[in-house]
Amino acid sequence: HLTVAESEWKFVRPMTTIDTNQKPGTLDISYAPILTAEQVERIRAFAVSREVTAGEILYQPGDDTPPVFVVMSGGIKIVAVGGGQEQVVTSYGIGQFSGELLMISGRKSIYRCQATESGTLLELKARDLRTIIGRDAELSDVFMKAFLARRLSLKQHGHGNVLVLGSRYSAATLAAREFLARDGHPFTYLDLDVDQTAQELLDHFGVSPSEIPVVICNNSTVLRNPTPQRIAECLGFNSNIDQSQVRDLVVVGAGPAGLAAAVYAASEGLDVLVVERSAPGGQAGSSSKIENYLGFATGVSGQELAASAIAQSEKFGAQIMVARSVNRLICDKRPYRVQLDNGHDIPTHAIVLAMGAQYNRPPLPNLDAFSGRGIYYSATFMEAQLCANEQVIVIGGGNSAGQAAVFLSQTCGGVKMLVRSDNLAQSMSRYLIQRIEENPRIQLLYGSELSALDGHDHLETVSWIEKSSGEISTETIRHVFVMAGASPKTDWLSGCLSLDKKGFVLSGRDLETVTPPNPWPLARQPQMLETSLPGVFVVGDARSGSVKRVASAVGEGSVVVQLIHQVLAEV
């Protein structure tokens, strides 16, 4: 990688002129609530009073776990800094407080915080903030609502320390954007195909088409075609996590099941680490809208659900490691050790396996060549933008495929659903079937399978076969969404746990019919959701015999915590 010099920054992000004399309190009240005198006094018990002078810098971009400041007198501002240029994001006055979600996640600061005038502040360290959030329900609501609203605003306006330059036709660009979006990190995106500034920057640095996307992180470091792991390292996503500490619980996977386990375990005082190979959300994170999840009458997107669950788990003290895969379970003795792809072993007394399952890939030789270039495994707003007003195909007959078809039909020219079976009744919720059947923009093709793909740099034509007649159809279609079947990623568990014929993890009474890799060492029998290894549990889609629904996964993740307490008492 290389570094952007201050003289070169004019190519990267032309700063918008902002009124630096912006008055505090002009933001919507949901973003900048004014604390009552009583609330301030309760905060004061955990905070340190600090006198500041005008212009004093309170923290800088890249500082570890910045504190929250409550303004008693004077004022403060939050500033985006880049290459000698500054942009005031917002400011806070008397009775207001700074901070957003990174204050509870423990990640590095993105912005500068600076006093606008001399005055008095209450400085609240991150650990004390978590104490207040855990003990005071009213203040917990005030802080969390403000932090969530601010992070959403930052994402929507692209206020952050990351700039992605790439092409809508680049699979690597889509992967980088999806990683940052699903992680919830604010970033700005410039498309080479529509933004001349982006092309000028790439020409300036001599970047070839094979090296896109270019990701500029921390407003200085330039990465060429980076992996999610490299982006996470550059931004310090996992830098505050102690990988040698013995944990009460390690959760593998940050989908609905894993996040539910993390929320309930952390809320009950357990030391929890979640390890996610990409970004949080799991398979549910690829869904644009889940309409049959309890409590969301108008539906909720998978990413929204995941973002709320992440904030909820972190507020109780859970830590989430992203862009790290688990390569091996070392199960010869306790505490067990979870070996990461960076070579580190994390010791833990209990483990919850919540890796989920991935969509089955049609057995076509050139499928991977079109991944991100016409073949997609998610249907979010990001993918929908790529195929506006065009014909698309959705493969699958489950809820995820149905949700994708309904969502894409709103902006695409039309949707063809390829379904292997002759009906949807056994695999899809009734409300979705009705939506699809009544939608004139969705065409159901029962008994059909994808048979061929063709194109050059991007998918151009698609063929499918109607199985009963053998008839093959070919059309010019540039976008296919694969959402059929489910396969677990459990090869790293071989030698430790019992798996079924498809690779899903066996648990509870299902273990009675198999011989485990290692003899069961305890007098008691395995508990519900417990695998063939004491203290190792499996929840969600990775479990053999599970119901592949978000609500079921969340239920299992919640229930397993009580069983973990019993296991920890045995250690």
Segments from the language model and where they lie:
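Cytosolic regulatory regions built on CNB/CRP/Popeye-like sensor folds
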Residues: T3-E178
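Conserved beta-strand termini and adjacent loop/short-helix elements that scaffold enzyme active sites
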Residues: A54-G55, L124, S167, L190-L192, ...
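Short aromatic/basic micro-patch
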Residues: V68, S91, E123, N225, ...
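A generic structural motif
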Residues: V79-V81, Q114-T116, I216-N218, Q339-D341, ...
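Beta1-alpha1 glycine-rich phosphate/pyrophosphate-binding loop at the start
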Residues: H159, V164, R168-D195, F205, ...
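FAD-binding core/adjacent interface of flavoenzyme oxidoreductases
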Residues: V194-V252, S267-E268, G285-S286, I320-E390, ...
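Rossmann-like dinucleotide/flavin-binding elements
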Residues: Q243-P280, P363, A369-S371, Y377-R430, ...
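A Rossmann-like FAD-binding core segment of flavoenzymes
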Residues: A306-T348, L353-M355, S409-A523, Q566-E570
